[in-house]
Amino acid sequence: MTTLTRGNRPTLLRLASALLVGALLAFGARAATDDMHILIGSYTHDSDSPGILRLRFDHKTGQIDPKPVQTLASDNPSWLVLDEERGRLYATNENGPAHEDPVGRVSAWQLDSTGDHQLIGQNISLGDEPTHASLSHDGRYLFISNYGSRPNPGGSLAVMPLAEDGHPLPVTQMLAHQSSGVHPERQQSAHVHSAVPSPDGKRLLVSDLGADRVFVYRYDPRQAERPLQPDEPASIELPAGSGPRHLVFHPNGKHAYLALELSAQVASFDYTNGTLTRRQLLDLKEAGSDVRHSPGAIHTSADGRFLYVSDRGDYNHIIVFAIEADGTLREIQRRSSEGREPREFAITPDGRFMLIANQLSDELVVLRRDAGSGELGETLQTLPAGRPSDIKLLAPN
């Protein structure tokens, strides 16, 4: 045992000073990680938004700093795709016949930890209103959903190769579904709304709102010009007039969940090697209500215990489901989005907060979330933002 005497007090002081400095440095390192960055896509044609906002989010307090770290000028960058492995950001420029610039495009930026993003390049999507995109697991292609509001030619799926530096190259493959549905206004032709790679990356599942089908394609990058080919079976048929919008896989890869926009329903499936087997078809409309519902975004929690669906229209709620052990759903909560048209939302990696993009009320909303129960709690912040349409989270610096 060491005995402390007056003679070694200088040593003690030096030791205490060193410990204090170390503690301050450690505190500073922790404080630096308290902030994460969020990226906000938007519609610029009917708002004052400049394009994409990069904002700082304090994931200790749940507060967004209203002063942007950076703004990226871009036309209608409604959907964002992050490739954090390669440090890139892609956006669909959802232009179409109703806009001043009618040409749908995809834009790409190189991400910089300082917030100084550099535009890599752009290319056209060969279709109207590219509303969604996803990245192949190997990072070689973007799969672009051209919604195509005009019945002729309607929607399409575009396959866009990416150069080694991330530059979007000309589209090499176009896939159009010659189909329509029963809805007199929304289903006169195919309207591709999203395309999602399977958990193993070997297939692409394409939700076509106009066709009432989810089309399944095999992905083979060895066929560089035409990497997608119809699977067998080539599609999964859904109830007439249901309007499939977005599909999400459970983290275990064994289940999938689909938002049906036109019928205001959520479907749950078992998934095996490209085959979706439907387990449930759940109504979001409350019995006897004439309120207009319109499900939009759909995401699971990172732990796979809960599913969240944004319900727009006149309802404007987030609907929370518990995911049972067999993958089926049980509704547990309906929580106001505190705004109009909750087009997208994101849950922070620690599960403590949900960030909502309320498109038509021009605002971002932060809700507290209970990671244990999955329920959404108090409203922590409401922040003005022009026509927000998507939210993506960047890892803390």
Identify the role of each PLM range:
Residues 66-72, 118-123, 179-185, 231-237, ...:
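A short beta-strand motif characteristic of beta-propeller blades
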Residues 16-26:
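Bacterial N-terminal signal peptides
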